[in-house]
From Swiss-Prot:
Substrate binds at N62, V63, E64. This is Cytidine deaminase 3. Zn(2+) binds at H75, C110, C113. Residues 21-154, 184-223 form the CMP/dCMP-type deaminase domain.
Length: 223
């Protein structure tokens, strides 16, 4: 299958070619997002489209895992934010999440995802599209309005702690000689896993971890 069929990141120019010429046109990519969702349990595919502060457009999808309860699923918003982190984005500006099976209604994220978004730097400024199929345009509402009387990282973390999508280094290392442990730019899978772990966000448990995988075609993935 064509690689573009599994495309989750669009430059501003690529997004424009898909009809995303201004914020209200983010839904033009929701069909692509929903087609990539994996919902074998509920059959309810959710897509999310977000614009990062850099101007690039990202897709997110829900992922359900057969044999496990639904609370182990990855929500589309969480998928999208992880996508931002893996691409070294500094923040999320706009977000559109479908709440209907036909992809024509857009609403606020679930309570779990609203709290998850609070882990991002300047989260309260994130604008979320609210639109029903009966509205021509809809409107953007800030997370500040959608999550009143909120709990935030500032309530528990030390002042100045790096938040999600902010630069961080967990100061982890692997045992071995200098020749065996290189850098995140080398071809060693363990070095890529170490780099992922050093960028891991786990401020409440202090248990950072990372993983790197390589497929049969030589492509590698990290998280």
């Amino acid at each position: 299958m064509a690689q573009d069929q599994y495309k989750f990141v669009f430059t501003a120019k690529e997004a424009e070619s898909e009809g995303v010429t201004e914020p209200m046109r983010l839904p033009n990519l929701i069909g692509k997002a929903m087609s990539l969702a994996l919902a074998p349990i509920s059959k309810y595919k959710v897509g999310a489209v977000g614009r990062a502060r850099s101007g690039r457009i990202y897709l997110g999808v829900n992922v359900e895992l057969p044999g496990l309860p639904l609370h182990h699923s990855i929500h589309a918003e969480q998928f999208l934010v992880t996508n931002l982190a893996l691409n070294s984005e500094k923040g999320l500006h706009l977000l559109a999440v479908t709440i209907s099976t036909d992809g024509n209604d857009f609403g606020a994220p679930c309570g779990n995802c609203r709290q998850f978004l609070m882990e991002i730097s300047k989260a309260l400024n994130i604008k979320i599209l609210l639109k029903s199929k009966y509205e021509a345009e809809g409107s953007f509402k800030s997370l500040r309005l959608l999550l009143p009387d909120r709990f935030s990282p500032d309530d528990v973390l030390p002042k100045g702690s790096p938040l999600l999508l902010e630069k961080r280094h967990n100061c982890l290392s692997l045992s071995g000689s200098a020749e065996e442990i290189c850098s995140s730019d080398c071809s060693h899978l363990k070095c890529k896993a170490l780099a992922a772990a050093n960028n891991s966000f786990s401020p409440y448990t202090n248990s950072p971890s990372g993983v790197a995988l390589q497929d049969d075609d030589g492509n590698w993935y990290r998280g």
